[in-house]
Structure formats: structure tokens, C-alpha cells
């Protein structure tokens, strides 16, 4: 595990302990009962693929450790609506506060503002967090293989499945991919960012994609800024993308989302 992830795990463990003391598991389950049913995150992405379209998981992210504040006028419901209007298939909403200035209420508010399924984007270590995710309205959780053992990942996956949620399993290299393929989740994200250097390169996705059987749905993550980037990854067998920063920085988020998915030329020809 990288030094960055070790530091994150330390504060997350403290956060989880404090959360458990404030809100019991029984309370979370009561909150889940008041939520609408999971919307089918994986299903929404496969529907795009089967229709011959790119599938976009559009991210709602206020800040990041490497870039600082990304969008000063941060309005999760408005962003969710803009992404939906632009053709996104799903949302990803940051709920981690120390590193990303995220919050649970951002997830709840964004999902309530649209019809898209939403991912709780956070660092997951305990099944309690899975129950939090569903209580807040999440339809999917993220598992970062670099920060989990195989047993931990499987336990979190199975807990998520038991609540009707999907699981996006994130990898950064070949050894993590081999571990991810042992899990039953069909959703595998390839993060193009090096966790040790923060450098980004699409060659990571292009290299690792060849390891994956056709029954899995691959998601390209990080370093995707243009329609040309999407086309490049499509050539490697990746038709689904998680994109945040490049869209969050645009004034017209809906137009930027459409341009990413279909290209400026297609829009100009309409």
C-alpha cells in the first residue's frame, strides 16, 4: 500500500469509529428503509454499451489532494441535472471530506435531483461504510484493491450485493487486476493514475485491458479529457469512463459532457 493510502486509512479508521459511536447499524438500516430502491448502476452502463454508446460515470468532486479546489460554485443537484442532460449514464459523488471536501449530503442531494444511479466515491474499509452508502442513497460502492486484502474486498463486495448495490472494483496494475478478477463483480475500473507519483497515462488502461475476459465491464478512470481519449480507450476494448475534473472545470457542464461522449464534430453536424 502506498504512503498516501496508509495515511488515508488511518483517518478513515478514526472516522468510522466516530461514526459508529454516533449512528448505530440499526439506525443506518432504518435509514435504508426510507431510501428508494437501488437504481441499477451496472445495468445503466450495460444498457449504454448494448446501444452502441459510450457509458459515462460523471463525477461530482469539489476538490482533490493533487489539484486543490476544482469548482468554487459547487452545487451537487445542479451538476447532477447537467450531467444527466448531457447524456451521462451514472454519477460518482465524493463523500470523503479530508482529501476531497466531499460529504454524504452531496451524494443524497445529487441523486435526488436526477434519475441516474450513483456511486459513493470513498475509501471503503468496513462493512459499516457499505450500510452508510445505502442509507445515503448510493446504488454502488467503490473498492480500491490497493488498500484492501482479498478477504476484505470480498466481504465488502458481498455486503454491498446483499443490499442490492453494485460494486466498482478499482485497480492500478497487473497484480491488482489478477486479484480483482477473483471477485464476482463484473465492474472493473482501471485507474490511470500512479498512486505513488500521481502521474497519469492512458497506457495503463490499454495494457491492463487485455487481461480482462468479455464478461466484465471495464471502466477507464483518470486522465480522460476529450472524445479522442474515449476513442483511444475504445480501441483497447474500454467503452465506459469515469470522468470528473475535466467536466467540473467547464462553465457549461452539459455541453462539455455531450462533447466528451459524441465529439465536437458530431455536435456541429446536428
UniProtKB/Swiss-Prot annotation:
HAMAP family reported in the protein's UniProt record: IGPS_B
EC code(s) of this entry: 4.1.1.48
Name this polypeptide is given: Indole-3-glycerol phosphate synthase
Keyword Lyase appears in the UniProt entry: yes
Enzyme class, spelled out: lyase
Organism: Rhizobium etli (strain ATCC 51251 / DSM 11541 / JCM 21823 / NBRC 15573 / CFN 42)
Pathway named in the protein's UniProt entry: Amino-acid biosynthesis; L-tryptophan biosynthesis; L-tryptophan from chorismate: step 4/5
UniProt catalytic activity: 1-(2-carboxyphenylamino)-1-deoxy-D-ribulose 5-phosphate + H(+) = (1S,2R)-1-C-(indol-3-yl)glycerol 3-phosphate + CO2 + H2O
Annotated family: Belongs to the TrpC family.
Alphabetized GO MF terms: indole-3-glycerol-phosphate synthase activity; phosphoribosylanthranilate isomerase activity
Keyword Ubl conjugation: no
Swiss-Prot/TrEMBL keywords: Amino-acid biosynthesis, Aromatic amino acid biosynthesis, Decarboxylase, Lyase, Tryptophan biosynthesis
GO BP annotations listed: L-tryptophan biosynthetic process
Pfam families from the UniProt entry: IGPS
Domain of life: Bacteria
Amino acid at each position: 500500500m502506498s504512503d498516501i493510502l496508509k495515511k488515508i486509512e488511518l483517518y478513515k479508521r478514526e472516522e468510522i469509529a466516530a461514526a459508529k459511536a454516533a449512528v448505530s447499524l440499526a439506525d443506518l438500516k432504518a435509514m435504508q428503509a426510507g431510501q428508494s430502491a437501488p437504481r441499477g448502476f451496472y445495468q445503466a452502463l450495460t444498457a449504454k454499451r448494448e446501444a452502441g454508446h459510450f457509458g459515462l460515470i460523471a463525477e461530482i468532486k469539489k476538490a482533490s489532494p493533487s489539484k486543490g479546489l476544482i469548482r468554487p460554485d459547487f452545487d451537487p443537484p445542479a451538476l447532477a441535472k447537467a450531467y444527466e442532460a448531457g447524456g451521462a449514464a451514472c454519477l460518482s459523488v465524493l463523500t470523503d471530506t479530508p482529501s476531497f471536501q466531499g460529504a454524504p449530503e452531496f451524494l443524497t442531494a445529487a441523486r435526488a435531483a436526477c434519475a441516474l444511479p450513483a456511486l459513493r466515491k470513498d475509501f471503503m474499509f468496513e462493512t459499516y461504510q457499505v450500510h452508510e452508502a445505502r442509507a445515503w442513497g448510493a446504488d454502488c460502492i467503490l473498492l480500491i484493491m490497493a488498500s484492501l486484502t482479498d478477504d476484505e474486498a470480498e466481504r465488502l463486495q458481498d455486503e454491498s450485493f446483499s443490499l442490492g448495490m453494485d460494486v466498482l472494483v478499482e485497480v492500478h496494475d497487473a497484480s491488482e487486476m489478477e486479484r480483482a478478477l477473483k471477485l464476482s463483480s463484473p465492474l472493473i475500473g482501471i485507474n490511470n493514475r500512479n498512486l505513488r507519483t500521481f502521474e497519469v497515462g492512458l497506457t495503463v488502461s490499454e495494457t491492463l485491458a487485455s487481461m480482462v475476459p468479455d464478461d466484465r465491464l471495464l471502466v477507464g478512470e483518470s486522465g480522460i479529457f476529450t472524445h479522442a481519449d474515449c476513442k483511444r480507450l475504445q480501441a483497447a476494448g474500454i467503452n465506459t469512463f469515469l470522468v470528473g475534473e475535466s467536466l467540473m472545470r467547464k462553465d457549461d457542464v452539459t455541453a462539455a459532457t455531450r462533447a466528451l461522449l459524441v465529439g465536437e464534430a458530431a455536435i456541429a453536424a446536428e
